[in-house]
Amino acid sequence: HMLNANESNSTIQALKAINRSPQHVKLVKNLPVSAGIGGGSANAAAIMRIFNTESIQAALSLGADVPVCLFSKTAQMGGIGENLSFCPGLGQLNAVLVNPRVSLSTAKVFKAFDEMFVEDGSVLPTISEGSLLIRAINGRNDLEAAAILLEPIIGDVLNVINNQTGCCLARMSGSGPTCYGLFKDAGASLKAANAIRSIAPDWWCETTILGDK
């Protein structure tokens, strides 16, 4: 469906940040609204790339995820997103993205996380070694439990993904509600996506490839 752009739109904000406003922009977006997979950040970064602007500070002023989207390379992020460590040569992963089409407030997820958090002195996982898949498996999403508390259907999504043949990892993206599954090959991811669409036809489900070539 068509949406009217206003001053809060990331595309308009990006044009203003690099002093290229006004422009006529036609944006075709094939993602659910507020999917939690960086769609708005990617839009802002795309505007900056069109005008050959690679300013980290300008990108960061638009959002913590915009710098990594600007360079569009496999990377680990530090700080609030301004410290990027690129990870070349890790290859690609076949993935399935699934969104149950529920609305989930990022602020509410973080609030729920804060209320659940208990300092236990545990050491953060190491995600700087091994293949792209190993790094993903060794990592974690601390917001997952909080999001499931607010929207239990996210737990259902993860279970459905995890039950698909060839699934190596199922996890929530960011603060949700979109979840992803990593699969051993393109055939497995395609079969999984078709199966998930049959199980839950109301969910948004797409295959994709993550990582650099």
Give the positions of each predicted feature:
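Short glycine/proline-enriched coil/turn segments at helix->beta-strand junctions
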Residues: A17-Q23, F51-Q57, S72-K73, G166, ...
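DPxDG-like acidic metal-binding loop motif
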Residues: A35-L62, V68
